[in-house]
Amino acid sequence: MKKLSLIIFFFIFQFSFSQSIEDQIKNIEQKVISWRHDFHKHPELSNREFRTSDVIAKHLESLGISVKRNVGVNGIVGILKGRKDGKVVALRADMDALPITEKNYLPFMSINEGIMHACGHDSHMAILMGAAEILSNNRNFEGTVKFIFQGAEEGPPPGEEGGAKMMIKEGVLNNPDVNAIFGLHITAQLPMNKVYYKPKGFYASSSRFTIKVIGTQAHGGTPWLSVDPIIITAQIINSIQTIISRESELTKEPAVISFGKVEGGNRFNIIPNEVNLVGTIRSLDYGMRDYIKKRIIELSEGIAKSYGGKAIVEIDDGADITYNDPEIINKMLPSLKKSAGNENVILSNAKTLAEDYAYYLNEIPGFLFELGGYNTNEKREAPAHHTPDFFIDDSSMLLGVKVMTN
């Protein structure tokens, strides 16, 4: 009954909008673009989104939206009440940038050295700010909208808390209690003006692992006096990749192991004492994730021991699997199709990306969808996320505002 009443509320909420909403959205497109450019020019890392959160809070306050600052470090929560009491729907965007030096020579290129919005969070914020403006000017709906601007989606710095987990811990889904939550992620490789969705598991879980390989240091000219941690590390890297290719049933669900950092040694003629590895595990099945974690430990320790060395493995779970509620998706598809057009709402495959948005979905129903950000008329290829060349087309954001508003 709870879910049924929530669904009925959605239809009341959508039905209340006048036909002029679409015109209003078109009228603020340049505003949305300018917000995105501003955020892109002034990116801030996880748990350091000070300027970013202030810009957002001031915008929401200017709309007459009740604002709470510093939720989960720098998170912003805005509450907009409709004409009557009713259910509470949350809309979420993430705010943090990445430690990447931008190579896009744009008028709004990052001015913060070594920091870049390379995953589209600048557009997520701009889209949700646009939706907040439209909804604040059209309060003839029943219920309440809670705008959640969250920091540290990419993960808080070592030794700090942050992200969705901390916002939930600090009560972002309460006072008033949220009945359902919706969010989007723009994707640079997908054609713009299209929306992509998947019921059940959509984005993968994410785990971070570190492996310290300890050997015996020696002169590069006398390797027989060493236990070479670089050789051990090479064997560990190759063997760990066989966990996916030879031990995982990929017809069941996809899984990925990637190494992001290998660090060891400080001089060409010294065999170092240790090498450190850092990597990520992605899986859409918790049983598979647990098996991969177990095998990483077994292989690392076993290989190191066989060479006379030692491996110390630490694995920390990050985001859970992003589980989209199938019933809510089915009931919301008419709204998506109304916003984007029937042919532009596309059933997607599962992705081995990860999103801490999953933690909200562990608490309440909702879903995350993808928004295409690539202009197929572009002469250059669509860039990968988390790279210095990442970009999205500004005009792709308009559909995002439309969907989040509807």
Residue ranges and their predicted role:
Residues D94-P107, F202-K212, Y374-R380:
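Acidic-glycine-rich active-site phosphate/pyrophosphate-binding loop
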Residues Q19-H117, A126-E142:
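Acidic/His- and Gly-rich active-site-bordering loop/insert found
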Residues L106-M116, S123, F141-K261, N266-I270:
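Histidine/acidic-residue-rich, glycine-tolerant segments that coordinate divalent metal ions
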Residues E29-V32, R36, H40-P43, G64, ...:
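Sec/Tat-exported extracytoplasmic proteins
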Residues S62, I231-N406:
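Metal-dependent amide/peptide-bond hydrolase catalytic core
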Residues F39, G78, L91, H121, ...:
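Divalent metal-coordination and catalytic microenvironments
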Residues M1-S20:
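Bacterial Sec-dependent N-terminal signal peptides
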